[in-house]
Regions:
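Short glycine-rich or small-residue beta-strand-to-loop segments that form or flank ligand, phosphate
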Residues: 29-34
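Phosphate-binding/catalytic loop of phosphoryl-transfer enzymes
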Residues: 37-135
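ATP-binding/phosphotransfer module of carbohydrate and carboxylate kinases, centering on a glycine-rich
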Residues: 1-28, 49-57, 71-79, 123-213
Length: 213
């Protein structure tokens, strides 16, 4: 948390300086943080550190999904969905009620995201490698990109170079995409499933919230 707050503080101060704006002239600063609203103790620590660091600017902290909604829908009613490294949906109804869906944690959530597709793609390679599924373009693509001479070398590469880094697992998605475009039907099916997962978030929020149209 302290490292994240330090980075945010640096960016805010640079933005103010670049715009020739004094902190005393700011009505407030809204900060969108991943995972905010999920752990009360962490939430309090984030608010405390940001408030101390950005004084005298008033600070308002929300989940980053809410910031995305505010930017994409100009704070109006509707549903904003994110599908990047992770996934989350955030919406506001016509009665100004808010709701979110998804965005739990990559270990068991983030369905439809690049991280989710990356993990599923790694599993798909293992199935194509040992015969549980017919070998498609993903098998040869991974062998070539990773310089594998034997299938099980994939395990050590993933455990050492990918598993500790969320963004690298998400980055594996590009191999799945290349394979799907090359005709790997199992890889293409992952994107169909991802689309269904994202659509489920939208349908869920649509049922939870009231909209004027």
């Amino acid at each position: 948390i302290p490292e994240s707050v330090a980075l945010i503080t640096k960016v805010v101060r640079e933005a103010l300086s670049g715009g020739g704006v004094s902190p005393q002239d700011c009505a407030g600063c809204c900060v969108g943080m991943p995972c905010y609203g999920e752990n009360p103790a962490n939430d309090r620590e984030i608010v405390r550190l940001l408030t101390d660091a950005l004084t005298p600017v008033p600070v308002y902290v929300v989940n980053d999904g809410e910031v995305g909604w505010a930017g994409s829908l100009a704070c109006g009613e509707g549903i904003h969905i994110v599908s990047g490294t992770g996934s989350i949906a955030f919406g506001r109804g016509c009665d100004k009620e808010f709701a979110r869906c998804g965005g739990w944690v990559e270990f068991f959530g983030d369905e439809g995201s690049c991280y989710w597709i990356g993990r599923q793609g790694m599993s798909l390679f293992s199935k194509e490698a040992d015969g549980r599924l017919p070998r498609g373009p993903l098998y040869d693509l991974v062998h070539g990109e990773f310089g594998l001479t034997e299938d099980y070398q994939f395990i050590d590469r993933i455990v050492r170079e990918f598993a500790p880094y969320r963004e690298k697992v998400a980055g594996f998605q590009r191999y799945v995409l290349q394979a799907a475009r090359a005709g790997d039907t199992a890889a293409a099916a992952l994107y169909e499933t991802a689309a269904l997962e994202l659509a489920l978030m939208i349908r869920t929020l649509k049922a939870k919230l009231r909209f004027s149209a």
